[in-house]
C-alpha cells in the first residue's frame, strides 16, 4: 500500500491496530519532512516505511490518498485541478490493483476562503474515466461533501 499525503500516519496506525504485520506492507509519502520524521520514529517495523515525496517509488497494489488534495495552495481552480490531475496520473502509473482517493465536493468546483478545494464530482469522474477507466464513488452520509473515488484495474 502506498499512502500519498500520509501526514502523521493515521492510516499506518489503523493498519497496525487491525492487521498482523505480515498481512500488509505500507509505504507513507508526504512532502512535509516533519511529518516523515515523526512517522519514522513513531512506527517501527520492517513492513512500514516513510519517504518524502508525492508519489510511490515503485509499483504498489493499492495507492491511496485521503484528504491529500483538500487544502489548495492557490485560489486558481484551473491550476489546482491541473495539479490534481497530474498527481493522479503519476500515482495511477504505480497502482497495480486500484487507486483510491477522496475529495470535498460541491455542485461547482471552488476553493473556499480557507483554501479548501471543493471538486465538481462529474468533472473528476469524467477525467478519471477518460484517463484510467471505470470509476466508482462512495458517499458517506456522516461526512457531508466528502466523496471517495475508486478506480480498479
Where do the protein language model's features map onto the residues?
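A short SAM/SAH-binding and catalytic strip from SAM-dependent methyltransferases
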Residues: 62-81
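Short, conserved SAM-binding segment of the class I
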Residues: 83-90, 94
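Conserved beta-strand signature within the Rossmann-like core of class I S-adenosyl-L-methionine
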Residues: 95-103
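Class I S-adenosyl-L-methionine
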Residues: 112-153
Amino acid at each position: 500500500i502506498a499512502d500519498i499525503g500520509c501526514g502523521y500516519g493515521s492510516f499506518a496506525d489503523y493498519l497496525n491496530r487491525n492487521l498482523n504485520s505480515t498481512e500488509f506492507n505500507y509505504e507513507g509519502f508526504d512532502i512535509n519532512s516533519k511529518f516523515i520524521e515523526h512517522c519514522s520514529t513513531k512506527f517501527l517495523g520492517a513492513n512500514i516505511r516513510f519517504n518524502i515525496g508525492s508519489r510511490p517509488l515503485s509499483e504498489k497494489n493499492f495507492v491511496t490518498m485521503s484528504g491529500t488534495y483538500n487544502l489548495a495552495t492557490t485560489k486558481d481552480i484551473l491550476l489546482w485541478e491541473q495539479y490534481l490531475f497530474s498527481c493522479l496520473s503519476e500515482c495511477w502509473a504505480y497502482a497495480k490493483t486500484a487507486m483510491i482517493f477522496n475529495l470535498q465536493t460541491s455542485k461547482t468546483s471552488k476553493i473556499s476562503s480557507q483554501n479548501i478545494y471543493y471538486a465538481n464530482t462529474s468533472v473528476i469522474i469524467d477525467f478519471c474515466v477518460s484517463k484510467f477507466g471505470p470509476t466508482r464513488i462512495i458517499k458517506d452520509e456522516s461526512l457531508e461533501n466528502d466523496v471517495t473515488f475508486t478506480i480498479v484495474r
